[in-house]
Amino acid sequence: MAHPAQLGLQDASSPIXEELLHFHEDALMIVFLISTLVLYIITTTVST
């Protein structure tokens, strides 16, 4: 059950939704790593 101040997704009620939650976590980590890499590249390019 979702709560009013909940920041994440609600608990999965089926195996497919459980796999979607795992996919969401993996995709979020990949986006974070790519964003960090792009920020590093921009920072090194601007500083030289």
UniProtKB/Swiss-Prot annotation:
One of its GO terms (molecular function) is cytochrome-c oxidase activity. It is found in: Mitochondrion inner membrane. This is Cytochrome c oxidase subunit 2. The gene is mt-co2. It catalyses: 4 Fe(II)-[cytochrome c] + O2 + 8 H(+)(in) = 4 Fe(III)-[cytochrome c] + 2 H2O + 4 H(+)(out). It comes from Polypterus sp. Its cofactor is Cu cation. The chain crosses the membrane at residues 15-45. Component of the cytochrome c oxidase, the last enzyme in the mitochondrial electron transport chain which drives oxidative phosphorylation. The respiratory chain contains 3 multisubunit complexes succinate dehydrogenase (complex II, CII), ubiquinol-cytochrome c oxidoreductase (cytochrome b-c1 complex, complex III, CIII) and cytochrome c oxidase (complex IV, CIV), that cooperate to transfer electrons derived from NADH and succinate to molecular oxygen, creating an electrochemical gradient over the inner membrane that drives transmembrane transport and the ATP synthase. Binds a dinuclear copper A center per subunit. SUPFAM superfamilies: Cytochrome c oxidase subunit II-like, transmembrane region.
